[in-house]
């Protein structure tokens, strides 16, 4: 489909979903639900935005089957999906908004590639990128402008390294990995020994960083190499911008780490863990599978059971909820205590009179 305008019926067929409404409605763009006009397609995923459904002018709204049962009586054009509405909307995004490339196909003449480096077929290396000795760049990879692939490092097939990424020596990047601008993979860890005279001596870090397949790493995120063992991010994990992962940390499969979180050295994060923004995790501990940490959680010891945690130090969400409720009740509790104190004073005065 290469045209710029589609009917509702055409889109339903392309997306392989059902529709309700006027199949001849023409759609030519995408927009948020509260701002969409008659030519726009939008979606409802988060129920917080359901309040905009009735007033939305969108030409079509992508919703789940469960949502459709709730809102089917509204006089709207609906595209009804069994999967996440956001995933279906993504297909529309890619249909209406054409991605833009850098305009530098192939290997640019200003790229510096060591003669011992191995560059496989169909690789794009943009201006002023550097590929060091014995590095290996897999087929169909994209290396952005000014990026560095360090000595003896490997980049797996179909990986996309954006501009100004630094991948240091002896780093292993898996297949289909995406690394956003400014990320640094494989810096020396923050390891020092303090002498008897109070001087801090840096310890060389000679371990590796291993990034497995289908990992995504956000802008300006840093992942340090181990001192003698490896720092590892397992398959399918997603890391936001400005995240610090220290030496010899292991992040399990399909975990998510949100912006400005920090993980200290030698900590092991389980599979399917979600770490909220600005969370801080101390070193040398373990986090169980299926743990969710709320934003700004401070973790000082291992978490052994799945669940939702928050606060500093980290506690189960139910406990935090009870504590918050008690704090909210403090003003009333203070009034009750003051009233009881007055009553006690009156009783004491009566007792003294008798």
From Swiss-Prot:
It holds the Pfam family LpxD. Its EC number is 2.3.1.191. The keyword Lipid biosynthesis applies. Coiled coil: none annotated. GO terms for molecular function: N-acyltransferase activity. GO terms for cellular component: membrane. GO terms for biological process: lipid A biosynthetic process. Pathway: Bacterial outer membrane biogenesis; LPS lipid A biosynthesis. Belongs to the transferase hexapeptide repeat family. LpxD subfamily. HAMAP family: LpxD. Catalyzes the N-acylation of UDP-3-O-acylglucosamine using 3-hydroxyacyl-ACP as the acyl donor. Is involved in the biosynthesis of lipid A, a phosphorylated glycolipid that anchors the lipopolysaccharide to the outer membrane of the cell. PANTHER family: UDP-3-O-ACYLGLUCOSAMINE N-ACYLTRANSFERASE (PTHR43378), UDP-3-O-ACYLGLUCOSAMINE N-ACYLTRANSFERASE 1, MITOCHONDRIAL-RELATED (PTHR43378:SF2). NCBIfam families: lipid_A_lpxD, PRK00892.1. This is UDP-3-O-acylglucosamine N-acyltransferase. It comes from Chlamydia trachomatis serovar L2 (strain ATCC VR-902B / DSM 19102 / 434/Bu). The lineage of its organism: Bacteria, Pseudomonadati, Chlamydiota, Chlamydiia, Chlamydiales.
